[in-house]
Amino acid sequence: MVLIALVFGPLPAYSHSQHGDVGNSPKSKKDLLRIGATVYKHMCVFCHGQDGNGGGDAMAYLFPWPRDFRKGVFKYRSTPFGSLPLDKDIYRTITRGVPGTAMPAWRGALSEDETWGVVEYIKSFSKRFTKDKPKEQIALGEVPVTDSESIKRGQSIYQEMRCSRCHGSDLKGDGPIAADLYDIWDHRVFIYDLTDPNAFKFGFDKKDLFLIMTTGIDGTPMKSYNHLNDNERWDLASFVESKINKEIYKPAQYESDLNTHVIDGEIDTDPENPLWNSVAVQNIHTLPLNARRDPIDQIQFQSVINDEGIAFRLQWEDAQPDRTSSRHQDFKDAVAMQFALGKVMLHKHGHNEPFFGMGNRNKVVNIW
């Protein structure tokens, strides 16, 4: 799919990543709550809602739906099944985002104090954090070497544990009961393709796989497999890791400066114009609004500018054509570009920029 757009006046854009490191903040809890409330109301409320119920204005367009923080149930943790997460677990999710969903990585957009502030503010939505304490972090120990024997043992365990009922015999997420699964919020569960490294929400290294098998994913049908001994879980992790096509992993920077190429000639809207052959291509990592097979997770960006206007050429791979749409909530094959208007400082802390999901009141955007 190739699309070219011609507009007047260059403006910046940015994309999101999956990377982040756990830090710390010396500020008091009171100060962090104040900071976190400000950030949450500017950056998070549109999806997660005013009271953290996951019912923000953007919810209708998203699947999976945003997390409801009020129950105090968190999917991705380093603590045992049923336990509250550690603060650093929530921090990790905020900074790294949740691949395969609309939850972006906020590292680079938020300072450490702001991120820790959001951690504290999220915890304030659930009474569990005032009544309970997180259990101790699961100790991983030394990661054993993967060999053909451990993979073979892991495959046997995969079959014995009937993992294929959900994940499919080839780990593509098409098991016989995959379409009939729901979480505790009564939301339908989407089973991702485990051969795709871009679909893993908590990491796809062997230690990450071992950890998720040990903790389970709270609130979902994915239970903990801690009834297996450590060696069995490591073998199962070896088998799953052996099926991951790591060559198709597409890392991205949190924010990308998108550059335009100055030309002297005229600009037309023909995407096959030879002028594009000499224009550098930049890759933008995209976030799917709705989980689906073969999502569009990367767009190739090019731009040229002259004295009269600016043009963009965008290309992406899409195996299934969708040229028409009969419902407003469905989308045909197309692309939209969003430009912040007014005096906006992107790439700066302070959050002067509009909400990236089509802007917000008093901070409008121009959408092409």
Model segments located where?
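Accessory recognition modules or surfaces
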Residues: L11-L32, V45-K71
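Surface-exposed, glycine/proline- and aromatic-rich loop segments on solvent-exposed faces
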Residues: N283-W368
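Extended surface/linker regions that mediate inter-domain or inter-protein docking
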Residues: W106-R153, S169, F239, E317, ...
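Extracytoplasmic electron-transfer domains, predominantly the class I c-type cytochrome c fold
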Residues: A60-R107, E112-K123, D180-L228, R233-V240, ...
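N-terminal pre-domain segments of enzymes
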Residues: H16-S28, I248-W276
